[in-house]
Amino acid sequence: FASQENMAKWLPLPLYFGGSEHNTMHLLYSRFITKALRSLNLVDFSEPFLGRRNHGFIFGPDGQKMSKSRGNVVDPDEQVSKYGADTMRMYFAFMGPYDQNYAFNFDGVLGVRRFLDRFWNFVQNHTNKKLKIADNPKINLVLNKSVKEIGEQIKQHKFNTGVSGLMKLLNALDKLVGSDGKLETVNHEMIVKLIAPYAPHMAEELWMEVLGNKTSVHLE
């Protein structure tokens, strides 16, 4: 029927993502087929997925379902061209809980764009390859706390609170390092790794071009 080795490696899948309409469509079909295969002793599991997460929907700026007739359609290609793919990716993550519905908000997009600009400038302005990482207990405390919290939020699919955590981290580092940079440089590699899942393109450029690493941040 199928490679036992491959089935043991890949199945059952850890998580199924989709809209609520999948509950009576693809999810239902896959569960039915899996149970049939189980009854024939062709697989040794009864459920194809170990978990299920519904995603929400994004409506037009007017709070209504996007429609050409309503004139409220937001062209994703146009937004990416204007603000960048990382901005849109982080904006969608920041809108709120993953399973809720939201109206598209242009001011929210601009807010995320400004944050990414601040993040980029912070890493550039406080990077000095001749200096060692500042051994500052306050900075280390903030960084370690953020790594733990944001990492857990990503695992729990609380992407919006993860972005909020990054914003709080940048605000805290701005205050601790100061505009004159007297605290030398902070562990930029750590904060670039933290932002990489949300802004992969910017993180890669900072990682390689500014911080001088030779391999991708996404391989770390």
Could you describe each region identified by the protein language model?
Residues 28, 45-46, 78-220:
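Helix-rich, typically C-terminal accessory recognition domains appended to large enzymatic cores
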Residues 1-98:
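Alpha-helical recognition segments enriched in aromatics with Gly/Pro capping
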